[in-house]
Amino acid sequence: MYSNKGAYALLLGSGISRSAHIPSGWEVEEKLIQKIEVSQGVAESEDWHQWYKDCYKQSASYSALLGEIVKTPTERVQLMRFFFEPTNKEKELGWKAPTKAHLAIARLAKEGYVRVILTTNFDRLLEKAFEFEGITPQVISYERAISQATPIIH
């Protein structure tokens, strides 16, 4: 890494944010399934995902779950905010804030060791860590934005 700065990319999943008390994708799905179950009068289930699969004849997906619970993009943002944005109490506890790992990655980027970071995360902890380092990252969060992105020069 030291002899070939910038030649590496990172791929991050939800594990990087778990210690910040951000739920994993699986856990978010479980909570969304629970919301659907409660609305249908089901109070408890040993396996939330299996209940959904049995009831809907398909595996749970974010799109399907959100389509069941909310109808507008604004409602979607409000629903998902609970999972990723800290409440006042969570702020006091230091939860849902960039971790040492997020900050270390931001420093690696600032120093030029890493130029490309791919993440499957919905949270913005990595972007916040970049802001702490004075970096404005180019974030591509949906497919159409790829064609509008600034090309990476090697």
Predicted regions and their residues:
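Conserved catalytic-core helix/loop/strand module for nucleotide-ribose chemistry
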Residues: 1-154
